[in-house]
């Protein structure tokens, strides 16, 4: 018979039979003599507490060094010496390690911690039932109400005590399937069903007794099952050996019993002449001097251990008896049918509450004054969506097309996932982008919030379609080679109570901070309590959910400043590192971001995370091991703000080239990880205007001066996009419609506009001809430049010519040379621009071409330029180029001349 003496821990996940095993072996002292019999010494004495703590501290610092962990590593690398901020990073690192220890006290590993959706919410269990679980520590009673039980708060309630409510506030409710009329209950109490396949092994007709007999026959060797069949034989024999054949039968007769070591020595003395085969294979001596044994440090005979690992496990009887879907449907009526409506019922100290479950995956918002409800989404195997395509490989550079599904159609209505899949995805592919970023996908009560006041974090918005519709969107995008990113909002949540998380269980501090700290200073939204382990469990599981369930490829974390600082980012900064470690910094929020990035990148190595932080917190894109937050990219928010300021407030001839360059390449240390954009949804949606609306919105080409205004607008629109695209990092973003100069802003239906949809759409018809067709052609050429030439992945730009007087900027990136003339009137026949390599340079993009809406002033004889041996701009050679006003040119070194 085999013996298992390693400590084993099992973690069971719902709806599967995956068993996670963790073993720890700690041997204090072992001595193996040459003879067969082993003598093993087990030290169980406890060492003084101070010595243990000292040793633990030393081992932690040693393990950090061995793992290459340095809490201030990026400060050292950048040569930043700030004692206060460095101390803040060290303390944050220590607090993060303590947080991980707390996590491991309640969760098996990080995968378990990030997979709360496998347990929480509503799930079909294999044993013909539905399990529901949710968190409500402030409630005294929990139940599920829905159309399947007549909305009764007593029909399906949590059981009393720990069977229905644990110490952490989680409620567990079982909804048993109902036997059909004339059907008998299952013979086996553990009978399982396969809800996907029509038939399984249990439908073969083999009885449970036969399966158990087969399991025993295959597992036990002859004679090994003797003590299983006669379980009292061993203790009776031991009792007889210890106390003799006429052993006492009562405690009074037993008298005093010598200690274990004395009895063992007596027994050995009595059996000293026995053959070795009759003696135990090992001697265990307790040197703990009466102190408790260390149950975690257990040693076994190598022979026993080898035999255990060589032994094949018995056949899993629960799989052998599992029946298929047809048997289940024949015997049972589902407790919660597909499409059922339900809510969570709480009884609190202030009275009863009905809530949409926090982990609900499909939610219908309030309609016509009715309360919102969750929908149980469990389509049949035939109707459920089946994935067709694998995920695309992550490209070296990202060209992201930012979208909002609801306004993606040309009609004045809320568009759907299905319409977006059919109409917008092919356009994105044709336009040359390699990723889409979706905003407003998680469920939100109010459409006019653009999806930034999330109410149900695990549910795709039902106003766009079903969960399977969203799966189809992601799958078709992958089929076109497009990555799919979500604009995720974990920096705050909607303040709605009936459908959101606010006052979820009746208490004011369930998911959010209590009092003023729990409310955004300006937006009225609720602020998460990131220091709470259960809130972290919710948020990190939410990140893992969208990747696991919907196969998304990454996230842009929205408005990090709102969560990192208790003032929500609305404060003046002194450009001092003290701003990032003072009393207004939420260390718990920072640790959440670190933990989220660490877990996501381990669980999903190809995931992309993007940080949107207006304060550019130090270390955003540094590795977690070096004291950073672990993001892959950060958003350069300053560029779009600069362009809007120039267009609105500064005359064309007063634009500063130095300011443009310093803003576009603000942080050279992290320029490679910068995501740039000229305009995103903020310029079009958040009360602003798109560049096209500013530049030529309402301009009549036939009116006096109209053509000049239109030409100016077209030229600047192209130049702004070209210089932003080519001077940034390895990622670029554009909002839907701006690539062709959408002439109108976005305005969602609200009470102020009589709930009009007239501006909540996109004018795709403008692509066919005219100005918008020219602008689209130019933008497509930009994307093709990166697709075919790899512009964005060729290292950082080398900016060598910035002339504020002439309003000319020039820089190189690999073998490519970019030249911009922003002057509103001055053209230059032979403008000297420095180049390092002598040779021939061919123009590969000219913003003045007629097909891009230009004037066609630059003719073909200007397309090939030969360098002149003349030192300019710190370069050894130069080009003499023809630069019309408000034009841009891109050259490629096609032939190198060696002298």
UniProtKB/Swiss-Prot annotation:
Residues 1-49 form a transit peptide. One of its GO terms (cellular component) is chloroplast stroma. Residues 47-67 are annotated as: Disordered. The active site is at residue 612. One of its GO terms (molecular function) is cation binding. Keywords: Amyloplast, Chloroplast, Glycosyltransferase, Plastid, Transferase, Transit peptide. The keyword Nucleotide-binding does not apply. GO terms for biological process: carbohydrate metabolic process; glycogen biosynthetic process; post-embryonic development; starch biosynthetic process. It holds the Pfam family Alpha-amylase_C. It comes from the Eukaryota. Disruption phenotype: Embryolethal. Embryo developmental arrests at the heart stage associated with reduced cell divisions and abnormal cell differentiation, thereby leading to defects in setting up the shoot apical meristem, embryonic vascular tissues and cotyledons. Modified starch composition. This phenotype is enhanced when associated with SBE2.1 and SBE2.2 disruptions. Its EC number is 2.4.1.18. It catalyses: Transfers a segment of a (1->4)-alpha-D-glucan chain to a primary hydroxy group in a similar glucan chain. Mostly expressed in flowers and inflorescence, and, to a lower extent, in seedlings, roots, stems, leaves, siliques and seeds. Pathway: Glycan biosynthesis; starch biosynthesis. Belongs to the glycosyl hydrolase 13 family. GlgB subfamily. Catalyzes the formation of the alpha-1,6-glucosidic linkages in starch by scission of a 1,4-alpha-linked oligosaccharide from growing alpha-1,4-glucan chains and the subsequent attachment of the oligosaccharide to the alpha-1,6 position. Essential during embryogenesis. This is 1,4-alpha-glucan-branching enzyme 3, chloroplastic/amyloplastic. It comes from Arabidopsis thaliana. The lineage of its organism: Eukaryota, Viridiplantae, Streptophyta, Embryophyta, Tracheophyta.
